[in-house]
């Protein structure tokens, strides 16, 4: 591993430069994926599944991966069996993750509110859960039982009555999803799992169909969960049919650090997210050139013993990753706010104070003892977060994702009469006189 001794992340030097937020976004590294480019390839898949249901989904799965399960829906007994066979330590860790996530998400549940505007005039905002949700759990480079937890817990807490998990079938497991995925579903009390992945899974969730044994595969009202570029494209296409959480891109970490940060921690955290994907983004923003150099040396040391060294090295060397040098922490705050990272670590003097100045991040991890890996598994927070700068306008998955606010308007005769003149005036101003007539005629005798 001598070549790793010379490993160095690319540098972006923003010192002595005064840049606007838009200029910062242009200067900062960002890879991402071109979803538009694959939409034409994915649309025929979605159309075929919309027309032919499970048959088309199974055909596409077989052509792409060489795997065709006997049925789309995994028999319930296999879920129970997977839980029974789950490693005891993994089960205990999953239970801790579930318990902590439930505690955090329970505090997110909104309550109905009623506003009384005048005697006999009320508007109530009633929060109602989505009725049926499809939760996508990817396959690929890793197994993600944690994604089962992060999708299911907020949906259950919101009160969603019906949910289905879709996850790619695995050849080594008889055309079923990975047993750890099945076990996590069983541990959470979810008994409907579909062995289908990719764009065809999203389409089948959106449009439903009939399984090979004649059982109904009911469509959902909303689809959540991350996936590859084809899954993202399918979600974009299907969003006129169902709701979606977001168009998730490759994972990303930004670390805002000063001279007090430990380069061992910084390097380990950059590597931890680079482990996901060759397109993963790892960005260090610092006012300390000494820390930047020490982090490079520590990256070389740790890469020598990293299991997925090729994948990690590709991610750290990609155009989406860099060490960004800034004049001071104030400039660093402006920089990370412009970047709007999925995960942002603060490793500085007065980390809580600095964190309080952050306005754009999917999740903020404060201090040396709050690594992103904690949030991935057992912090209690949700790890399904906005990527590609979307944290400037969007939030991570939460109980609110699965709730709909419905306004319930109730006026009595006197309350309507009191405001009727204003309604009629505004309807005339908008040249929609029938609106006013609908009120006026109620008071004709």
From Swiss-Prot:
Substrate binds at residues 251, 273, 276, 343, 376, 430, 435. Pathway: Amino-acid biosynthesis; L-histidine biosynthesis; L-histidine from 5-phospho-alpha-D-ribose 1-diphosphate: step 9/9. One of its GO terms (biological process) is L-histidine biosynthetic process. Binds 1 zinc ion per subunit. The keyword Acyltransferase does not apply. It catalyses: L-histidinol + 2 NAD(+) + H2O = L-histidine + 2 NADH + 3 H(+). It is an enzyme of class 1 (oxidoreductase). Gene3D superfamilies: 1.20.5.1300, Nitrogenase molybdenum iron protein domain. Catalyzes the sequential NAD-dependent oxidations of L-histidinol to L-histidinaldehyde and then to L-histidine. PANTHER family: HISTIDINE BIOSYNTHESIS TRIFUNCTIONAL PROTEIN (PTHR21256:SF2), HISTIDINOL DEHYDROGENASE HDH (PTHR21256). Belongs to the histidinol dehydrogenase family. This is Histidinol dehydrogenase.
């Amino acid at each position: 591993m001598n070549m790793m001794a010379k490993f160095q992340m690319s540098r972006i030097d923003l010192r002595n430069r005064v840049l606007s937020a838009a200029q910062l976004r242009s200067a900062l590294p960002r890879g991402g994926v071109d979803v538009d480019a694959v939409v034409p390839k994915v649309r025929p898949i979605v159309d075929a599944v919309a027309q032919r249901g499970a048959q088309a989904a199974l055909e596409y799965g077989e052509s792409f991966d060489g795997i065709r399960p006997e049925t789309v829906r995994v028999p319930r007994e296999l879920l129970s069996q997977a839980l029974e066979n789950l490693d005891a330590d993994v089960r205990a860790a999953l239970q801790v993750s579930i318990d902590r996530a439930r505690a955090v998400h329970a505090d997110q549940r909104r309550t109905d509110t009623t506003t009384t505007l005048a005697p006999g005039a009320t508007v109530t905002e009633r929060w109602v859960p989505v009725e049926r949700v499809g939760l996508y759990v990817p396959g690929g480079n890793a197994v993600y039982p944690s994604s089962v937890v992060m999708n299911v817990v907020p949906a259950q807490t919101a009160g969603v009555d019906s949910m289905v998990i879709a996850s790619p079938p695995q050849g080594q497991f008889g055309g079923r999803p990975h047993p750890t995925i099945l076990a996590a579903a069983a541990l959470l009390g979810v008994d409907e799992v579909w062995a289908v992945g990719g764009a065809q899974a999203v389409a089948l969730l959106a449009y439903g169909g009939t399984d090979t044994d004649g059982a109904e595969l009911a469509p959902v009202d909303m689809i959540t969960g991350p996936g590859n570029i084809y899954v993202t494209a399918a979600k974009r296409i299907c969003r006129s049919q169902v709701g979606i959480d977001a168009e998730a891109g490759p994972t990303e970490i930004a670390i805002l650090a000063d001279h007090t940060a430990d380069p061992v921690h910084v390097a380990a955290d950059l590597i931890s997210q680079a482990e996901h994907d060759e397109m993963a983004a790892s960005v260090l923003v610092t006012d300390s050139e000494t820390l930047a150099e020490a982090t490079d040396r520590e990256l070389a040391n740790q890469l020598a013993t990293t299991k997925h060294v090729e994948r990690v090295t590709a991610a750290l060397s990609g155009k989406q990753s860099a060490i960004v040098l800034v004049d001071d922490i104030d400039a660093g705050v402006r920089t990370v706010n412009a970047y709007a990272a999925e995960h942002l670590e603060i490793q500085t003097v007065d980390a809580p104070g600095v964190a309080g100045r952050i306005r754009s991040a999917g999740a903020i991890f404060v201090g040396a003892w709050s690594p992103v890996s904690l949030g991935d598994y057992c912090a209690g927070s949700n790890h399904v977060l906005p990527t590609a700068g979307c944290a400037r306008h969007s939030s991570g998955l939460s109980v609110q994702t699965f709730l709909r606010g419905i306004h319930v308007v109730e006026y009595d005769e006197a309350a309507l009469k009191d405001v009727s003149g204003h309604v009629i005036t505004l309807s005339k101003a908008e040249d929609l006189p029938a609106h006013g007539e609908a009120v006026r005629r109620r008071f004709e005798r």
